Amino acid sequence: MKRVRRTRSFVVDALCDEVDLSRRHVARVVDSFVSVVTAALERGETVELRDFGVFESRVRKASVGKSIKTGEVVSIPSHCVVVFRPSKRLKSAVRGYRSGEVGAD
């Protein structure tokens, strides 16, 4: 199965089809949503969307790695990463799709 990449534009168009709002208005809502989630994660907060998943930021500990080019050992400082944990409902929907169960009617 070939992977298809969907962009912000696809999301905006799909939402326009779902609701009776202009493309410009929906684009502003999508941008605002991304800004709100980003700001919350920057403050170390967790964002939970029921039946979709949880966004959170975590601190990854400092570690030691190896340069692929030179083989030299390098230290990797601790840093924040964004983690998304899908809900059971989302996992189940994707699992069904990937195994060919969806649309098999």
UniProtKB/Swiss-Prot annotation:
Classify the source by domain of life.
Answer: Bacteria
Pfam families linked to this entry: Bac_DNA_binding (PF00216)
Q: Which GO terms describe its molecular function?
A: DNA binding; structural constituent of chromatin
Query: Keyword set for this entry?
Result: DNA condensation, DNA-binding
User: A GO term (biological process) for this protein?
Assistant: chromosome condensation
Q: Which InterPro entries match?
A: Hist_DNA-bd, IHF-like_DNA-bd_dom_sf
Under the heading Gene3D superfamilies, the entry gives: IHF-like DNA-binding proteins
One GO cellular component term: cytosol
Q: Is DNA-binding tagged as a keyword?
A: yes
Tagged with keyword Membrane? no
Q: Which family does it belong to?
A: Belongs to the bacterial histone-like protein family.
Relate the protein's function as given in its record.
Histone-like DNA-binding protein which is capable of wrapping DNA to stabilize it, and thus to prevent its denaturation under extreme environmental conditions.
Name under which the protein is recorded: DNA-binding protein HU
Q: Which organism is it from?
A: Treponema pallidum (strain Nichols)
Q: Encoded by which gene? A: hup
